[in-house]
Amino acid sequence: MTKVYYDETVTQDALQGKKIAVIGYGSQGHAHAQNLKDNGYDVVIGLRPGRSFNKAKEDGFDVYTVSEATQQADVVMVLLPDEIQGEVYNKEIKPYLEKGNALAFAHGFNIHFSVIEPPSDVDVFLVAPKGPGHLVRRTFVEGSAVPALFGVQQDATGQARNIALSYAKGIGATRAGVIETTFKEETETDLFGEQAVLCGGVSKLIQSGFETLVEAGYQPELAYFEVLHEMKLIVDLMYEGGMENVRYSISNTAEFGDYVSGPRVITPNVKENMKKVLEDIQNGNFSRRFVEDNKNGFKEFYQLREDQHGHQIEQVGRELREMMPFIKSKSIEK
């Protein structure tokens, strides 16, 4: 059975007297840094020039370049976008790591796929909250927390596991519970969830439903409401109580349709395709494609983004959200 670590079984001892450099001050960076600081940890911020630099200063942190922050720190937590971590690490972190330091991440992508290859004399661990940074911070301030995963890739000092747990406690995660994993497991399951279900799977399911109704002659506005807008109602129910809560809350007509028509849409071949997606993640095909496209200026990525931006469902959605000022402010400006 999975073991969960809580506040009462984890101490801050492994990080006593150590300085932590949080590299990045975006969604996760600001939450980690502020929570650690509020828990009494010694924190500095490492950033490149930009808006985040001033924001971190306004929040009361000592802010340095990435290399300067690394030189001061015992623990370096890298909270930058996946695609820039490798370059920043090689130029501004790696030259300044010392024996016995700890290198940390909130996602295992660059370590697992060897984009970043740390020296053998430093600890390498991850602490990955299962929620966005604003929620990590808000729940901490409210006295609760977002659960997290932790894992150790390299234990040079014999203390990497304790340091990782102390770090998890520092951001508040042990209030809710922390589950041990590996870089491999965290990375592959995270990518699979994004590609097959949460982002890729759901977006194509919604688009296909929209296209089916519009091609059958139904008004695009009604199609949007039925397959996209109402998705939030169902997801919220699922989030709060699982699929059982959805089926308890919807009409008998909807529940019966769930049972008889769901398997007609998500057929066994869909699961087989999911297995192929997982295989491409496991064998490194996806990571290589992503890394190579990044090196080429993200030509494929930006073209795919532009193609999706032009889909009819996006235009219809922009127009309909004008009727709903309570959500209009969440629209993304291009």
Swiss-Prot record:
Pathway: Amino-acid biosynthesis; L-isoleucine biosynthesis; L-isoleucine from 2-oxobutanoate: step 2/4; Amino-acid biosynthesis; L-valine biosynthesis; L-valine from pyruvate: step 2/4
Signal peptide boundaries: none
Residues involved in substrate binding: 251
Keywords, alphabetical: Amino-acid biosynthesis, Branched-chain amino acid biosynthesis, Magnesium, Metal-binding, NADP, Oxidoreductase
Catalytic residue positions: 107
GO BP field: isoleucine biosynthetic process; L-valine biosynthetic process
Domain KARI C-terminal knotted residue range list: 182-327
Residues bound to NADP(+): 25-28, 48, 52, 82-85, 133
Cofactor(s) this protein cannot do without: Mg(2+)
Cofactor comment text: Binds 2 magnesium ions per subunit.
Top EC group: oxidoreductase
Domain spans labelled KARI N-terminal Rossmann: 2-181
GO cellular component terms attached to this protein's record: cytosol
Tagged with keyword Protease: no
Binding annotation for Mg(2+) 2: 190, 226, 230
Pfam families on file: KARI_C, KARI_N
Gene Ontology MF terms: ketol-acid reductoisomerase activity; magnesium ion binding; NADP binding
Catalytic activity as recorded in UniProt: (2R)-2,3-dihydroxy-3-methylbutanoate + NADP(+) = (2S)-2-acetolactate + NADPH + H(+); (2R,3R)-2,3-dihydroxy-3-methylpentanoate + NADP(+) = (S)-2-ethyl-2-hydroxy-3-oxobutanoate + NADPH + H(+)
EC number(s) per entry: 1.1.1.86
Binding annotation for Mg(2+) 1: 190, 194
Family: Belongs to the ketol-acid reductoisomerase family.
PANTHER family in alphabetical order: KETOL-ACID REDUCTOISOMERASE, MITOCHONDRIAL
Function: Involved in the biosynthesis of branched-chain amino acids (BCAA). Catalyzes an alkyl-migration followed by a ketol-acid reduction of (S)-2-acetolactate (S2AL) to yield (R)-2,3-dihydroxy-isovalerate. In the isomerase reaction, S2AL is rearranged via a Mg-dependent methyl migration to produce 3-hydroxy-3-methyl-2-ketobutyrate (HMKB). In the reductase reaction, this 2-ketoacid undergoes a metal-dependent reduction by NADPH to yield (R)-2,3-dihydroxy-isovalerate.
Protein name per the record: Ketol-acid reductoisomerase (NADP(+))
Organism: Staphylococcus epidermidis (strain ATCC 35984 / DSM 28319 / BCRC 17069 / CCUG 31568 / BM 3577 / RP62A)
Highest classification ranks of the organism: Bacteria, Bacillati, Bacillota, Bacilli, Bacillales
